[in-house]
């Protein structure tokens, strides 16, 4: 389609070849030839320029995209959608095509913040998906919207109930629990003291929390003492 070709040409006009090499290394799940090399601020600027244009409407219908930057641009074009139903439907249509952490973690339609109660049903669906980045996105939405005033302790159980061997899913689970330790410590800490998480997520949560500026030195010291040294030790402690 000429509209899609025109947008692709705009992306290549913004290409930085040195950045392409750097960015490709950050996304090892993507073939390097699918990364153009456009910096995120420029992608967001282009998304603002294209928002609500006929060209953008055509582009959003053209899935799958080939380039990482096309997927990132697609994600950024969804953020200003004002109608909740449309934003949710378009997000769910797009998620099966998200194939890397950078796009997955980069977007959330702003209207989601005004519909937290309704969004929970979608999050439950996403957490139950067999697609890596759909699950990761669901956990990310729990982290973004439900660790402050909308927090409920059962949401921790939702994230913990996700069972996956995928690194990108489990890393997001750890990130979620580390953030929960900073924002909802009383509810989150028992998940570590009682060793309710798998060993990898348990230890990675502690690592990320210790790296966080939002965790006090005293909390970090206590968390370090909770590290599990081996799978065998964890099993012995649960007997």
What does each model-identified segment do?
Residues 1-239:
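Alpha-helical scaffold domains
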